[in-house]
């Protein structure tokens, strides 16, 4: 009798065929189900508590999946899809995960009918390609050549409103203030493109948060704000026509790299040592003054003696500024970062109309306005607590990305589930022209798209199935812009009239991320999970059998 062949390491678990596939589908569906209730303007928040006890309250899909400690490898694929969505377009993460979950749920029904995963994958790919082809035909091209025109600003307001309304950070006057700030920031940094759109570098838009006041107290600064104060009481608090030295070298006496001791045998030697130290620091300050600097912004420390000499020269100085801020200052001020003070030249200096220390709440901050590169802007957010500020920052980031998307490709689509309904209808027509079992997969893709309007109807307080039937009937009559007005809690014939619109780039990326994640999971038919390391076995809760290896072959485990 032949001896058994040991192919895998002891303790390795393996699940094959349909069992592996269904296990992965279940894990992905579970994650999608968790995010389902966070979709749309009336989406509910999730409270996330990390291992240190820090609490995050948000309905932002990207933040939820990043902060959840997902273990199951298939669910991680959906997390990667959400991250790709966030990195590419900065919005639509919840939609991408929910749609991927719906695609896998519909695929499971087809698997029950003994349709091979390869056929489902091919059908999904054809449906995705057709949907991408249909999007521009169903969209409306907008004229944004003059960003300061009332028509262009009105369109940008609608886009920003759709994004911010789902975050619920503010209402009424506060929401209008935030929308105006976001639009002004985007318009300020936009660069025209040959296709009639604009390129927007979001690196030029800095967001700072300061606790205190309300959202309405937030301001847009055409320049930069540093969350630091002037280092010495004898320094000026306001400098106009500032020539700014940006340093990543310390204004301190450097310690030698090797261990060294100084042997002092008399009081005169102590005095000589201290005098030499003062002279060294004075020479550094004199050098900065000689090249014309009247403001010094330093990434590292500034010695007390150096502060004294800077104050005597009437130079405003700020120390221990973050590296990211130093790099932004370099771009905004037209400066060159100075690493060696003795080699500094006047050409290394940046320029700003005004550098001023101002009190914000209980703290002081340094405002740099009228920078050489007028494209740099800073949004300073105010709010009552850290959680509100964090959510406001996430919301504004989403709105900035949404506006960037519309400026890159100025085509808008009807929101409120209208575009998904219309795509589903067109895909069913297309499916009839495709022969074989792939037709069923294309129809399943169309059914999955209808999950989005159904969820929106649910969050609006409507009965989901009835709402879907109503939407289908109206779309069949040619009312292509019929969708769900979630805030009003009703179905409307023209979502454009209520400013419920979405950029085409976001929707195209949602389809791409969801389809890629779903097809990647459908391709897997073998799940081999290595045994956990001994340290994990000791420290982990439960046995390998309970967790299914590395979140793998047993019951789907999304987190700890």
UniProtKB/Swiss-Prot annotation:
Forms a heterooligomeric complex of two stacked nine-membered rings; one of alpha and the other of beta subunits. Sometimes called a 'rosettasome'. Molecular chaperone; binds unfolded polypeptides in vitro, stimulates protein folding and has ATPase activity. One of the most abundant proteins in the cell at all temperatures. The keyword Cytoplasm applies. GO terms for molecular function: ATP binding; ATP hydrolysis activity; ATP-dependent protein folding chaperone; unfolded protein binding. It catalyses: ATP + H2O = ADP + phosphate + H(+). Keywords: ATP-binding, Chaperone, Cytoplasm, Hydrolase, Nucleotide-binding, Stress response. GO terms for cellular component: cytoplasm. NCBIfam families: thermosome_alpha, thermosome_arch, thermosome_beta. Residues 535-560 are annotated as: Disordered. This is Thermosome subunit alpha. Residues 535-547 have a biased composition (Basic and acidic residues).
């Amino acid at each position: 009798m032949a001896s058994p062949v040991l192919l895998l390491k002891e303790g390795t678990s393996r699940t094959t065929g349909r069992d592996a596939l269904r296990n992965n589908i279940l894990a992905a569906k579970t994650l999608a189900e968790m995010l389902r209730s966070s979709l749309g303007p009336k989406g509910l928040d999730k409270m996330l508590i990390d291992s240190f006890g820090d609490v995050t309250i948000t309905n932002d899909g990207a933040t939820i999946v990043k902060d959840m400690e997902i273990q199951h490898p298939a669910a991680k694929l959906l997390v990667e899809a959400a991250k790709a969505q966030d990195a590419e377009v900065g919005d639509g993460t919840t939609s991408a995960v929910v749609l991927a979950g719906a695609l896998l749920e519909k695929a499971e029904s087809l698997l029950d009918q003994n349709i091979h995963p390869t056929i489902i994958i091919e059908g999904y790919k054809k449906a995705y390609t057709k949907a991408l082809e249909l999007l521009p035909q169903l969209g409306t091209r907008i004229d944004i050549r003059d960003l300061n025109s009332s028509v262009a600003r009105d369109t940008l307001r609608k886009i920003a409103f759709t994004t911010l309304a789902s975050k619920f950070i503010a209402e009424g006057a506060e929401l209008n203030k935030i929308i105006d700030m976001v639009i002004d920031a985007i318009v300020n940094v936009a660069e025209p493109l040959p296709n009639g759109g604009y390129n927007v570098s979001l690196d030029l838009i800095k967001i700072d948060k300061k606790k205190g006041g309300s959202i309405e107290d937030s301001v847009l600064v055409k320049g930069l704000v540093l969350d630091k104060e002037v280092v010495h009481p004898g320094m000026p608090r306001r400098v106009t026509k500032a020539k700014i030295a940006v340093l990543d070298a310390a204004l301190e006496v450097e310690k030698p790299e090797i261990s060294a001791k100084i042997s002092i045998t008399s009081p005169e030697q102590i005095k000589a040592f201290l005098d030499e130290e003062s002279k060294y620091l004075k020479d550094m300050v004199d050098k900065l003054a000689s090249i014309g600097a009247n403001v010094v912004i330093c990434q590292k420390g500034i010695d007390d003696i150096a502060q004294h000499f800077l104050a005597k020269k009437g130079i405003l100085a700020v120390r221990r500024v973050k590296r990211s801020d130093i790099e932004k200052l370099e771009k905004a001020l037209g400066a060159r970062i100075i690493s060696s003070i003795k080699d500094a030249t006047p050409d290394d200096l940046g320029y700003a109309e005004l550098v001023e220390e101002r009190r914000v709440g209980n703290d002081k901050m340094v405002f740099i306005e009228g920078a050489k590169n007028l494209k740099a802007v800073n949004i300073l957010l105010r709010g009552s607590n850290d959680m509100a500020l964090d959510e406001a920052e996430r919301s504004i980031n989403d709105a900035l990305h949404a506006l960037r998307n519309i400026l890159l490709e100025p085509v808008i689509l009807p929101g409120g589930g209208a575009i998904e309904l219309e795509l589903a209808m067109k895909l069913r027509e297309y499916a009839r022209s495709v022969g074989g079992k792939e037709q069923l997969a294309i129809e399943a893709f169309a059914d999955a798209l209808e999950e989005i309007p159904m969820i929106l109807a649910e969050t609006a307080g409507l009965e989901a199935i009835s709402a879907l039937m109503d939407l289908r009937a109206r779309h069949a009559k040619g009312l292509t812009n019929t969708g769900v007005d979630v805030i009003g809690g009703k179905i409307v014939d023209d979502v454009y009239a209520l400013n419920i619109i979405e950029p085409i780039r976001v929707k195209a990326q949602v389809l791409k991320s969801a389809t890629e994640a779903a097809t990647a999971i459908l391709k897997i038919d073998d799940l081999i999970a290595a045994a956990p390391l001994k340290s994990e076995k000791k420290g982990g809760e439960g046995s390998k059998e309970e967790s299914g290896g590395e979140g793998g072959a047993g019951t789907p485990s999304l987190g700890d």
